[in-house]
Amino acid sequence: MSAIKLEICTASVEDCVKAELGGAARVELNCALMLGGLTPSLGALRESRAAVRLSIIAMIRPRPAGFCYSRAEFTVMQRDAELALAEKADGIAFGILTAAGAVDVPRCRQMVKLAAGRQAVFHRAFDVVRDPLKALEQLIDLGVTRVMTSGQEASAYNGAAQIAEYIRRAADRIEILPAGGINRFTVADVIKRTGCDQVHASLSTASQDRSASGRPQVSFGGTVKQSEVEFTVTDAEAVRRLRGALAE
């Protein structure tokens, strides 16, 4: 399995460095992973590009929740994509759907055009489309580089049969990137059952910043109570262990 490419989901410069130290070949750079991953700052992208040599795919997602965007939101996505690519991102990850849950072909075409030959990745918005096989053909026709998917299940392990079908249907016309719940305990089975040549994983551990712990009654998340002490960071050792599992 040593030829399997490992992509790690990251949210900071430090995460990218740890992913590279652990043996990843590529990172998807986001912010706000607790919201499913949003567009990273230009500062984070620029400093990550300076810090690591591996491939960086910049997430282009302006807000949490669904993937049907207003005109203003889509304009922001276009500008963010242009800026990310100007900062030497190796590609962009995006997912744009219609209100009916289908691929928004015209808007996705514009995003692929903006990528201008660099990697254009359709992220896990694919996992909520109503007709995944039709969506796959549409993305192939658009010239999308890669589709990230859990097989429309809670994890790639659970969706392995569907992922295998996508790979069979794709027939090397587009890359299929299994994602969702992949770790060193599940990766071998996912690879065996899908026949994939790459995997995406989010391997994190808790870190703490106790500077806001003096007033526990204060929360910066509005009515949603969340920890103001803990946050997650990429676990370099977990990346290394997963990379080791791929070498077995």
Show the residue positions of the predicted features.
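Ordered, amphipathic secondary-structure segments that act as subunit-interaction surfaces
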Residues: 81-95
